[in-house]
Amino acid sequence: MTLTVFQRKLVTAVTQMIPDNLNVFNAAANGAVVLGTGEVLKDVIEKMSVGLIANLVTDRNAYAPVGTPATAKVLARMLTNSVNLSAKVGPVAITKAMMAKIETNVNSVAAEIAAQATQAIMLHYLKAGIGAGKAAIESNEAAKYTQPARVDGVGGRTFPTLADFPLAASKFGDQASLIKSWFMDGVTWANFIAYQALPSAEQVFAIGDLQVMGDGLGRRFIISDAAADAMGTGNMLGLVPGAVAVTTNGLDMLAQEKGGNENIERWWQGEFDFNVAVKGYRLKASARTPIEGVRSFKLDDITTSANWELDQGQVDNAPATVQDVGAVGDVDTKGRRKTQAAQAVPTRHIKETAGVLVTLTATTAS
């Protein structure tokens, strides 16, 4: 009975703490990586992910012949291109000492474990989202920025300068101001604030090893070694609002006794599913097909840049129209049904994608 009560208390605590922390993180990080349930994300993504469609209005030739194809524009279809992943918490053995504590104060133990589980789950969400974002953006050469070589008195130091942020964001042209969230590891952040003068830096969110810092220009710096593991050493991500969506699908947790061995064992564990989508990108069919329906996607699958491509949209079948094929010649050739030229696949402008990938360059000694 005690384990049943503990399980109920644990589930209640975790399911309350995760949404609360996700909502605060979403606001603190300028909505670059949006974490939440499907209903929450649906509204957020519809508001943020479409953004400005590049070159929406263009010249038109009023004298163009029938059948002249037009270049289509593409709206972001993030959630339809999402990838489903599964993960687990534990299993963790419940020691006799912990069991005694559970029997004494079940609320305290449930709250303590829930806090640890919440932190671990959030970091896993972030690791998957940032890893997928980095891999997707890396597949697009137009979205990659390499820091220029620099010389200093020591050499071998890797950190961004204040100039690198606007220079990297300039990949987005007149939409550069959209990139206000920068993801990096703890060492990169430490070197950055040590060697650069960051105006009015202050902490706006923290849970465990994850920190979100803000500056006087409205930028957010998300520092996490867990997420940086997915990005790789010496990389930073600059993301727009709604760049990455992580849709949470609930959490199941179980605490129970197990017999049949030398001693009675007690365990607790949890499992959850979630979806990851990156604005302007999709997982290639060649990467999806061998996995879907066979096994669950793993982090390695979505953090490999070769598995991603720009979401170029789709085209309809070329329509058939009735028109006068020729002004001269046999009457039988007139009024025939003619198929128009095949439509061009819509191309996605970089401004309609998730952001930019920054590769930092180590300094050389003078």
State the predicted function of each range.
Residues 88-99, 184-188, 223-226, 232-233, ...:
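Helix N-cap / beta->alpha transition motif
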